[in-house]
Amino acid sequence: MACEGILTEDILFDCDNPTTPGIEVNIMLINQSDIDDTLTTVDPTDKLLITNLALKAAKTAIILQGIKQINSASAELVKKDVSTDKWRHVFTGVALSLNKATKTALQEMSEGAKLVAVIETKSKGAANADAFHILGRKMGLELNTATWSTAENDGTFQFELSSTEGYE
């Protein structure tokens, strides 16, 4: 696939499927090393379309359960001087329970876990074709910030996973 960056399609407003802000409450977090690249299917004509995200044998995704719109995701362009521009992915999450399992997961994240986040947006497009987005697929997301305070946000643990600077 060429890296020429030639615009090939119109950017139109789909009045039958207007965008809606937000993501669904359940997020899948996957250890990047648990993804089976040989069984994962990327559309040969569209490198942004993954039709099958496969995990290695006996590996599973971790569910981060949210409520309302406390979790969010974003992407921002990172201009590169000597290579093609990249996208920095950011997932902002909230751990609603501070039990041992949650603390263990956050500790594992802080020890350098490389993660992939699969989110389902509220804006799904025609026939749900645009419902899912995969963040950190190529380079993984790492824990960037984590904050807990008994005096803020109902005592929940706020954290951010993002592409590592320079490794988008």
Regions found by a protein language model. Give the residues of each.
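Structured, beta-strand-rich domain cores
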Residues: 67-135
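Generic structural motif
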Residues: 18, 30-35, 96-100, 122-124, ...
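Solvent-exposed edge beta-strands and adjacent loop segments
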Residues: 2-90, 139-151
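Mixed-charge, glycine-accented linear interaction segment located at domain edges/termini
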Residues: 134-168
